[in-house]
């Protein structure tokens, strides 16, 4: 048949596994064997080519990660496509008489306004995670959070990384491009299925990053194109959500599916809502203290001369040593500094030299991928001791700092103090992604993902998903407060600027 190009493992050929099981923490995951080493091993065992392997490929054999068997008959991949068949296809159009997509949005608003037990699923692309979700209730409590680097035991982050190492070569190899495309779509399909289950389990709406509102770029593991594909697939999944394990006429069965979205003409025309999906601006989500709402808005780029540095230090209310906490305290009012045009709900803050921070190592005037750990209080003490400044009495140190001319060193310590996200490069430690706050919260604690329990975000990417969920919660609360039967809902109530977000977060309006 010409229907499908046969890919056959001939009888007598040796088949080799493409992945192996590895224990990580308390989980077993499937780790892919890089394509180049798999090909070497396959050719070697089937006596194809030179009969030699690289040391890297040999290591997989020596460590027992390779399982092989000899085919006792011809094995044809996707055999069902190799034969001619007739298929009787009878399409059914659900909601054939529906006149408008608008009803989906309006009925969603009514559902949210009337439903007591509702949750919000925040979805975020991460710097260290392909996708991260956080499920919160109407009081902002985390009910569930997880990364989607590993799905069904497979480390897809590593798998995609391995596949795309040969991206340049892949551009010339359409078969390899097709494999990467299929891998991404297969991954997204599994993630979307999981999210769809959560929507039904928690009576949840979905909050996700608005692609048309300052879409974040930079060091993210899911690029814009793939994220748009994810968004499209999620809309299509929730447009008519059915579960195969339910009876045909049961709620959620094939004839009584959940219609939770509508299919838009294009993503750009969706606006801020597509049924159960709400789009929120993602600004100030991952690098914000989830317990106090503190965020670093300082700009250090223009502190290029002593005059500007003296002015910066002089604007602090106090710089002093706190003997009880055994840390240094910087107190300030954000109104005295440039705030990137942002209006805060709380402007007066006290930050402390709490814990350690990562500082990237500079070689020949350029930043490297390596970092060093700086113990803030210890570094501050040594700096003041070298300058001959006494600090144990707890008095304000600003005058002596300027007098001794160490403003640059103090500002460097302060910059690290308000640097909340601290991530090592992948070459150092791919798992190290710590968020640590310099501000005491209501419990008298400094938020730190290294010590936070499961009721709080577990890393910086988790914090991004959590805060996106909280932005979704803001909209849920606005709907509950302003929706009225048989009246047009005022859509302007769902607009969120930075001022609104900081007020909601810093004043804990969600409690």
What are these model-derived regions, one by one?
Residues 3-4:
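Short, small-residue-biased leader/transition segments that mark boundaries at the very start
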Residues 24-30, 42-46, 448-457:
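Charged, low-complexity surface segments at secondary-structure and domain boundaries
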Residues 76, 84-511:
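Positively charged, helix-rich recognition surfaces that bind polyanionic ligands
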């Amino acid at each position: 048949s010409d229907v499908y190009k046969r890919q056959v493992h001939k009888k007598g050929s040796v088949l080799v596994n493409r992945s192996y099981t590895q224990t990580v923490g308390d989980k077993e995951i499937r780790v892919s064997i890089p394509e180049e080493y798999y090909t070497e091993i396959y050719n070697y065992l089937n006596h194809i080519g030179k009969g030699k392997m690289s040391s890297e490929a040999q290591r997989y054999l020596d460590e027992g990660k390779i399982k092989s068997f000899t085919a006792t008959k011809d094995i044809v991949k996707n055999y069902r496509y190799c034969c001619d068949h007739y298929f009787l296809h009878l399409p059914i159009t659900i909601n054939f008489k529906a006149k408008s997509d608008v009803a989906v949005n309006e009925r969603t608003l009514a559902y949210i306004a009337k439903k007591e037990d509702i949750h919000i699923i925040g979805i975020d692309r991460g710097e260290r995670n392909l996708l991260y979700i956080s499920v919160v209730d109407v009081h902002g409590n985390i009910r569930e959070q997880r990364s989607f680097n590993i799905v069904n035991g497979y480390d897809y982050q590593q798998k995609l990384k391995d596949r795309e190492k040969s991206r340049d070569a892949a551009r010339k190899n359409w078969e390899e491009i097709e494999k990467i495309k299929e891998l991404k779509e297969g991954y997204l399909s599994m993630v979307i299925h999981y999210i769809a289950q959560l929507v039904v389990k928690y009576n949840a709406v979905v909050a996700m990053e608005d692609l048309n509102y300052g879409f974040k770029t930079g060091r993210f593991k899911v690029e814009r194109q793939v994220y748009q594909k994810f968004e499209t697939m999620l809309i299509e999944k929730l447009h008519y959500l059915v579960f195969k394990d339910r009876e045909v006429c049961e709620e959620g069965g094939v004839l009584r599916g959940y219609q939770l979205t509508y299919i838009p003409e294009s993503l750009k025309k969706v606006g801020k809502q597509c049924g159960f999906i709400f789009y929120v601006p993602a600004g100030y989500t991952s690098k914000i203290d989830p317990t106090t709402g503190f965020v670093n808005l300082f700009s250090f780029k223009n502190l290029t001369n002593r005059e500007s540095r003296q002015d910066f230090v002089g604007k602090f209310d106090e710089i002093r040593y706190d003997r009880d906490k055994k840390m240094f305290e910087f107190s300030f009012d954000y109104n005295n500094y440039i705030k990137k045009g942002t209006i805060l709900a709380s402007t007066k803050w006290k930050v402390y030299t709490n814990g350690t921070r990562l500082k990237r190592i500079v070689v020949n005037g350029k930043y490297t991928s390596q970092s060093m750990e700086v113990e803030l209080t210890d570094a501050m003490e040594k700096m003041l001791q070298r300058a001959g400044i006494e600090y144990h009495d707890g008095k304000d140190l600003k005058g002596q700092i300027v007098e001794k001319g160490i403003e640059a060193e103090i500002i460097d310590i302060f910059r690290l103090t308000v640097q909340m996200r601290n991530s090592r490069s992948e070459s150092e430690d791919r798992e190290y992604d710590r968020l640590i706050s310099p501000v005491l919260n209501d419990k008298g604690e400094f938020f730190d993902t290294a010590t936070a329990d499961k009721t709080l975000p577990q890393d910086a990417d988790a914090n991004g998903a959590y805060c996106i969920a909280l932005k979704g919660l803001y909209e849920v609360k606005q709907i509950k407060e302003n929706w009225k039967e048989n009246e047009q809902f005022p859509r302007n109530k769902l607009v969120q600027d930075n001022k609104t977000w900081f007020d909601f977060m810093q004043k804990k309006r969600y409690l």
